[in-house]
Amino acid sequence: MKKFLLVAVLALMATVSVMAKTDGQTYEPVNDLKIVNVWIQDRFHTPDVFPKKDYCHTRARTAVLSNGVVYIARSEVKEAITTAGDTVAQAVIYRLDAATGEELAPLDVTLNGEPYGAFLGVNSIGADNFGHIWIGAYSSEKSAENPFYQLNTETGELTLIATLNKGDNISRIDYFDVMGDITREQAECNIMAPGSQTANVYRWHADQGSDTFEGGFEGDICLVMTSFYPETVTEWSYAPYARMCLGSSEDDMYMGELFYVDGFNSAPALYDVTGSLIDSFEAVESSLHPEAGTNGVAEFNIDGRNFIVYSRAQYAGTGRGCQANICELGEGMSLGGMTKYWQIPADSLGQTSDGGNRVHSFNVEYSQENGSDVVTLLTFKCFNGIGVYKIGKNVSGGGEEPQPLTGDVNGDGVVNVSDVTSLVNKILGDPTYSDTVCDVNADGVVNVSDVTTLVNLILV
């Protein structure tokens, strides 16, 4: 009986450890700012947990952090029957507590009271500047319009915000960005999306209080860009991503007059609404250049300093996979003068192909901790992993880091023969597992004596 209770307690501890897992990295403070990982779920740190999650899927492409909750949108999850008797593949929004990583009840997505099952119907999810969650559906190069919705975060019901017309220059749209208020009650609303495999950028604008969206480029819906970085690029290629920047005054706060576009074969570049290239990675040292094939960028401000976070490389990068750089922008918020602070995670989220979805989601929330400003940063890479980080002068992690189970080399929460295999691979040169978990006998080195200790643990 005692042995059964001990096993049950250990199993419970292992479960808690997995749920509260951090990346285990120590990030050095830079210019009085610290960063800590609150929690992480990914193929690298929780390889036997994250791949089993319903939101680890190639149709779960984007995520957003809003009001302390992480929302992950997955299209075409499960069969549902409409009142007309039709079968559709219903979309689901998965929710996690941003403070702990604990799963909250998912939202089955509906439209007009019916299961919502449009093809890639929740391809793009985000939050406006007033906490409203929006959903942008995928649309092909043959579709002249794109539906855009608000999500009810209690029920999963969608409300149509606008049917966005692409005008005469039609191209495929994968991902959107929003600045302002999608309800137009508290501010204007601007919606942007670059066109896939084109040089198109679409923009729609509605004044505060207006029911109508119109072209956001001085009345035009689409602007064809002519300047890129690198200069050899002539279009965005696959699944590009746009991100508008907050203005510097009350009058222009939500105009989104400056915006980044990050394409498959280009680095993030900053434009204005005339199409002029304002800034790029041209003057950035080469070691900080992102690799081709991954799209994602965001800005934030803390302690009077301006930062950029961008996708460094995707699963096939020369690094360890799906990481992001966090850099302080240079004088005048220039890219060329930026200073790297950290790479997150320092090791990896994962190195598994997501089928070419390209997008890497980032966004932030602001709060205070221990009397100082704090930025909470979400990083999400489809089919590879998700993590929440905090940045500030006095930040601390998401509670005390659970102590690893001695002998649990592969981090799956149990000690068995699979850990022996992992340990032997480590000794033979596999860098996947840390020295800390592999030093089973705690003598300061990892060698064959640790294998003996581990085998004895299993046989006890």
Task: For the regions a language model picked out, list residue spans one by one.
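Beta-propeller fold detector
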Residues: 24-48, 103-112, 158-167, 211-229, ...
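Signature of short aromatic-glycine-proline-rich micro-motifs recurring in repeat-based ectodomains
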Residues: 48-66, 113-126, 135-139, 166-193, ...
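Conserved beta-propeller blade signature
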Residues: 69-72, 132-134, 187-193, 254-261, ...
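Short glycine/acidic-enriched loop and turn motifs that connect beta-strands
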Residues: 76-84, 139-144, 195-199, 264-267, ...
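Beta-propeller blade signature
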Residues: 88-101, 145-156, 201-208, 322-330
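Blade-loop segments of beta-propeller domains
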Residues: 88-131
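Loop/turn-rich, solvent-exposed surfaces of beta-rich toroidal or solenoidal domains
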Residues: 281-348
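Cellulosome-associated attachment modules in secreted, modular CAZymes
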Residues: 395-460
